[in-house]
Amino acid sequence: MFEYQVSGENMLESILKNTSEIVSIEEMNELLKKEGEKIAYIGFEPSGKIHLGHYLQIKKMIDLQKAGFKIIILLADLHAYLNQKGTMEEIRALGEENKKAFESMGLIADYVYGSEFQLNEEYTIDVYKLALATTLNRAKRSMEVIAREDENPKVASVVYPLMQVNDIKHLNVDVAVGGMEQRKIHMLSREILPNMGYKAPICIHNPILTGLDGEGKMSSSKGNLIAVDDDEVTIKNKLKNAFCPMKEVFGNPVLEIARYYLDYPVNINRPEKYGGNLVLNNYGELETAYIEGLHPMDVKTLVAEQLIEILNPIREKIK
């Protein structure tokens, strides 16, 4: 466990940083005042490549750990199986690789495979109870963002959200963390778990990083990612070719990485004929400079240099 590095309002501010929303901030503030163990969890379907999108989630778990939370990482092997990600053996092997990557990022956590408890009798009965308490339309809506690419969804896509809600109960979770694509499932858990005699979880939703091609989210299946174990040449080449439209911020993956990963202030070194050297004290200044005409290649070079510095130690530990 990390020693506390923040306290009081600073602790809440650290947890809020770089999140899309917390439901609710008032509940989080009250939880931070309480004594005793507090549990925060996030679930990951084992994935072939751990990338910056995953790392953004892990950074938030580290923030929570520094605030005194016990961290549980659910390696959701049964969820991945229901989502047609491979055989259980293949998924478990990926889970072990993912665990090593998360540990290499500096996260100290309890790692739990879903199959370790999701096949138990009590868990199964609770899934049935949730099925009785949830309308079919409500369950389908909760999976819309997660399964939107599936043209012919299976019945499993309705079971999936019920299991995820049940995970929160059976892992004794106080705070559920995920990307914005998890919001509908988390809201379902807040709505339905109190009716089963369990507390409503506080929910932290993090941004979804745009893929390097500018089309949809950063994803292992699409290959539009920077993996945490990419080498220096690969990182430079990927950023060189990344979608980064001049003066446009919205949906710009390079600017998103600059927002969530760069350590400010930053220096951009340029010849005098191109405006000379530039010092940017925060992301807001970088965004303003970009809108005013800072060249995409200057930003790409800056982001590549800092990402290499951040990811090199992680890559070395993963080897």
UniProtKB/Swiss-Prot annotation:
Enzyme class: ligase
Residues holding L-tyrosine: 41, 160, 164, 167, 182
Enzyme Commission number(s) from the entry: 6.1.1.1
Tagged with keyword Cytoplasm: yes
Alphabetized InterPro entries for the sequence: aa-tRNA-synth_I_CS, aa-tRNA-synth_Ic, Rossmann-like_a/b/a_fold, Tyr-tRNA-ligase, Tyr-tRNA-ligase_3, Tyr-tRNA-ligase_arc/euk-type, Tyr-tRNA_synthase
GO cellular component terms given for this protein: cytoplasm
GO biological process assignments: tyrosyl-tRNA aminoacylation
Record GO terms (molecular function): ATP binding; tyrosine-tRNA ligase activity
Principal cellular location given in the protein's record: cytoplasm
Keywords from the named record: Aminoacyl-tRNA synthetase, ATP-binding, Cytoplasm, Ligase, Nucleotide-binding, Protein biosynthesis
Compartment(s): Cytoplasm
Assembly: Homodimer.
Name used for this protein in its record: Tyrosine--tRNA ligase
